[in-house]
Amino acid sequence: MIQMQTMLEVADNTGARHVQCIKVLGGSKRRYASVGDIIKVSIKDAAPRGRVKKGDVYNAVVVRTAKGVRRPDGSLIKFDSNAAVLLNNKLEPIGTRIFGPVTRELRTERFMKIVSLAPEVL
């Protein structure tokens, strides 16, 4: 469950380390984002020679949440931290590698690239 001001780790190789959610996209009254939702983020911490720099604003898709994802069979998939993957304006991933596991909920037409790059799909 991600809302405005939430700090997230970055799960790709764009050079960003931590980002802050500045908006949950998808309706004017939308308050929370979960796995698979698109948010607007600001880069708070970045590597010196990365693709992105501190202060830049990007779209990102949430790939892991500490709150977890409830499956139809009743199981709950939780993670230790919140993580996102940075996207460009066409909603394609900027990075070429994904770090850590992602959930099966990302397996939609929009995010198949992220699922295929991920080392593990839970």
UniProtKB/Swiss-Prot annotation:
Cellular component terms (Gene Ontology): cytosolic large ribosomal subunit
GO terms classed as biological process: translation
Protein task: Binds to 23S rRNA. Forms part of two intersubunit bridges in the 70S ribosome.
Family: Belongs to the universal ribosomal protein uL14 family.
Record-linked Gene3D superfamilies: Ribosomal protein L14
Domain of life: Bacteria
Upper lineage: Bacteria, Pseudomonadati, Pseudomonadota, Betaproteobacteria, Neisseriales
Entries under HAMAP family matching the protein: Ribosomal_uL14
Name of the molecule in the record: Large ribosomal subunit protein uL14
Subunit description: Part of the 50S ribosomal subunit. Forms a cluster with proteins L3 and L19. In the 70S ribosome, L14 and L19 interact and together make contacts with the 16S rRNA in bridges B5 and B8.
The gene coding this protein: rplN
Keywords recorded for this protein, A-Z: Ribonucleoprotein, Ribosomal protein, RNA-binding, rRNA-binding
Keyword Ribosomal protein: yes
Keyword ATP-binding listed: no
An example Gene Ontology molecular-function term: large ribosomal subunit rRNA binding
Pfam family for this entry, one: Ribosomal_L14
